[in-house]
């Protein structure tokens, strides 16, 4: 089976490095599926999911806060601000962050950084969606 190398990295660390049969990510114009021998491209990624199907068939689900995806003949590189594997997400902590961001946005005052509250809300929502996908996959 043909594979493509996949690297997911942030400014702080390498998050994933391995061979994949398919990489799925949410670009600005919709969902992208990157398979081996895909045409070269570069695009911005929206906050959302990145799913890597490894050479042995394992589905790895990541929640990302946005980034850049680049496809070259032998490698797909995903540069992200933040990324977390669905299985590593602490649901209670994420729900707390989401509720706090929603509260800040609902009670906007002069001291509220709206952009930061919206960023936190988006990031928490993306992580909770990743957890839900993980739970659905575990049921199958």
From Swiss-Prot:
Lipid bilayer topology: Peripheral membrane protein
UniProt xrefs under Gene3D superfamilies: ATP synthase delta/epsilon subunit, C-terminal domain, F0F1 ATP synthase delta/epsilon subunit, N-terminal
Keywords: ATP synthesis, Cell inner membrane, Cell membrane, CF(1), Hydrogen ion transport, Ion transport, Membrane, Transport
SUPFAM superfamilies found in the cross-reference section: Epsilon subunit of F1F0-ATP synthase C-terminal domain, Epsilon subunit of F1F0-ATP synthase N-terminal domain
GO terms under cellular component: plasma membrane; proton-transporting ATP synthase complex
Domain of life: Bacteria
Stored CDD domains: F1-ATPase_delta
GO molecular function per UniProt: ATP binding; proton-transporting ATP synthase activity, rotational mechanism
Entry's family note: Belongs to the ATPase epsilon chain family.
Reported function: Produces ATP from ADP in the presence of a proton gradient across the membrane.
Protein name: ATP synthase epsilon chain
